[in-house]
Regions:
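Extended ligand-binding clefts on enzyme/binding-domain cores
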Residues: 361-362, 372-465, 471-482, 494-533, ...
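Short glycine- and acidic-rich boundary segments immediately preceding or forming the N-terminal edge
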Residues: 1-35
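Extended ligand-binding groove/face enriched in aromatic
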Residues: 298-408, 412
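Active-site-adjacent mobile loop/cap segments within catalytic or ligand-binding domains
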Residues: 155, 162-167, 176-228
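Short beta-strand-to-loop junctions in surface cap/lid or active-site-entrance loops
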Residues: 34-46, 55
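Alpha-solenoid repeat junctions
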Residues: 269, 276, 324, 375, ...
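CBM-like carbohydrate-recognition segments
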Residues: 182-186, 234-241, 246, 253-266, ...
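Active-site/substrate-binding loop(s) of hydrolase catalytic cores
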Residues: 27, 44-51, 60-177, 187
Length: 566
């Protein structure tokens, strides 16, 4: 049987026991299969969380051993009531399918070179990047690696061997070396800026596997119920923070610069002003922001120098109406209205000059952000007319409800769909209830969110390629869709049926904001690409990032507003 057939056979033996997922995508665009057991991410229940890794070598016998271990776990009396086991049973599927073991057929070797260097996930060894991130964010209490070999050996991380004496006395486990293997690297230092994992590695002949696993299941029965790994505890602590807690962290890092004037910085400036409105303990940033933009206001610096006049730059003023309200200085509001007037001139096809004539989805947000606010400030219907004509003429939404990147680019980019969700939420925020185009705008928006509902991962996240299983869970699309959900629920154009979708998005994002404002997997700046492969290969930023920080801050403040009102 093929690997896929083996997995299907395993799943058919106990329907519903595991959920088939993908934890990565190889260079040949083959999914790295993952079997998920349990509901919450990070896990909130009482069961201890196990993660099994097999097939790193790309050899059939190693994948067979991992699948046999899954069967043994499922049929062991009482074990699944105390432990939830998820697995990547063949972590090197290209090596297996292409006969390239232990390499992956693209010049990489998923069994070595951990932690993987550089940004993710576009190099010759994407399996290593995907596995490195995936294992940690399963919040495992124990990671078990299984591989075949002539001699039987158990190896455990220092933390694991300290947890329970029986790992040594029953399994005769020696200490796992701190090497460049996946388990060795996960067991030391700060993998993914999280504490190290508890790790065990079993090497044995196939004929000895059942006996060795039965020893392990017996030992695991003696692990204390409260034995949570540091990794799981850290992720649960992130999940336990309130949106205001997360907002305070983000506001300490982002929104303190506006050079150049661009939405990736301007949204964060707006986020700081919103946080001050929500949190009496957060110092009013208005004076500091006014001082920051003073060189622009005086004319000493240009707002939009040559080459910096696109929609992304104009949307860098989304804070201006809020600063005008906070300070009473109407010059900021006037600036925003003057900027909105740039949208009055059009390309030959009627698209406003600051926007791409092919109706790129990012321009939907830039246009809505500027023109919606200009209408709010002036009451001039012309701004709404330009905006709604752009949205309704775009025809970028497809029959399934999702959005292409533009009219000529048939790919469901994650942040592209985030831009679309955010743009319609912003438009509906400023559009009067009796506006003749409101029903059409709202219908598109609801159909989009309903489509996105079907692609929300169990972690709460949406992926870099929305309909691409195994592409990485991406931070900005989740924040933008989360914002649209929270705004719609607050303002009443979405019903309570969307609340669970929002809650899950918040949980996913919360786990991916560290205590210093670092973020997990923010797609770098991305123009129109020519293939799914090119979207998969856009670098995923891990750590501080102004784009991700800005959109996260908007989402968490909107989430805080939703919770305060409900």
């Amino acid at each position: 049987m093929t690997l896929d057939e083996q997995i299907e056979d395993l799943l058919s033996q106990a329907p519903g026991f595991w959920h088939l997922d993908a934890c990565g995508v190889t260079r040949s665009e083959r999914q790295i299969p993952a079997l998920l057991h349990g509901v919450d991410q990070p896990p909130a229940g009482e069961r201890l969380q196990l993660v099994l890794i097999g097939g790193l070598s790309g050899r059939q016998e190693d994948a067979d051993a991992a699948l046999a271990a899954l069967h043994s776990y499922r049929t062991a009396p009482g074990l699944s009531g105390r432990y939830a086991l998820s697995a990547a049973p063949c972590a090197n599927p290209d090596g297996l399918a292409l006969g390239a073991a232990p390499e992956n057929g693209a010049g990489g070797n998923p069994g070595t070179a951990y932690p993987p260097p550089g940004d993710s996930y576009y190099d010759a060894n994407p399996e290593a990047h995907y596995l490195w991130r995936w294992v940690s964010f399963q919040a495992p209490d124990l990671v078990l690696e299984i591989r075949t070999g002539e001699a039987t050996t158990w190896e455990g991380s220092a933390l694991c061997l300290e947890l329970l004496e029986q790992f040594r006395s029953v399994l005769n486990a020696s200490e796992l070396p701190s090497d460049s293997s996946l388990l060795g690297a996960l067991s030391t230092g700060e993998p993914n800026l999280l504490p190290p994992v508890f790790g065990l590695r079993l090497t044995c002949a196939a004929a000895d596997l059942d006996a060795e696993l039965n020893k392990l299941w017996t030992v695991l029965g003696q692990v204390p119920d409260h034995a949570r790994s540091p990794t799981r505890s850290a992720l649960q602590a992130r999940a336990a923070r309130s949106p205001l807690d997360a907002a305070r962290i983000l506001a300490g890092v982002y929104g303190h610069e506006l050079d150049p004037v661009i939405y990736t910085q301007g949204v964060a400036v707006s986020g700081r002003l919103r946080l001050a409105h929500l949190d009496a303990e957060y110092a009013d940033p208005s004076d500091g922001i006014a001082a920051m933009v003073a060189p622009y206001m005086s004319g000493a610096e240009e707002w939009f120098p040559a080459g910096g006049e696109g929609g992304a730059n104009l949307a860098g003023l989304v804070w201006a109406d809020e600063l005008a309200a906070a300070t009473g200085d109407t010059r900021y509001a006037d600036l925003l209205v003057q900027t909105a007037d740039r949208y009055r001139a059009t390309h030959d096809n009627g698209v406003p000059i600051p926007s791409n004539p092919n109706y790129q989805v990012e321009d939907m947000f830039f246009t809505a952000a500027v023109l919606g606010r200009a209408f709010k400030l002036t009451g001039d219907e012309a701004y709404l007319s330009i905006l709604t004509r752009f949205l309704l003429d775009a025809k970028v939404q497809q029959a399934d409800g999702l959005f292409w990147h533009d009219r000529r680019t048939p790919f469901y980019w994650g942040r592209g769909n985030g831009f679309a969700a955010l743009s319609y939420a912003e438009t509906l925020t400023y559009m009067p209830d009796d506006h003749p185009d409101r029903a059409a705008v709202l219908a598109i928006h609801r159909r989009h969110l309903q489509a996105l509902r079907g692609y929300q991962h169990r972690s709460g996240m949406w992926r870099q390629v929305v309909n691409g299983p195994g592409s990485y869970p991406e931070m900005t699309v989740t924040c933008m869709v989360g914002y649209a959900l929270a705004r719609g629920l607050r303002r009443g154009w979405l019903d309570a049926g969307y609340t669970d979708m929002l809650t899950r998005a918040w949980q996913g994002v919360a786990a991916r904001i560290d205590d210093h404002g670092g973020l997990v997997d923010v797609c770098t700046g991305t123009g129109v690409q020519q293939s799914t492969r090119e979207y998969l290969d856009r670098p995923a930023i891990f750590g501080p990032d102004e784009r991700g920080g800005a959109l996260s801050l908007w989402f968490v403040t909107e989430m805080a507003s939703f919770l305060q009102e409900n």
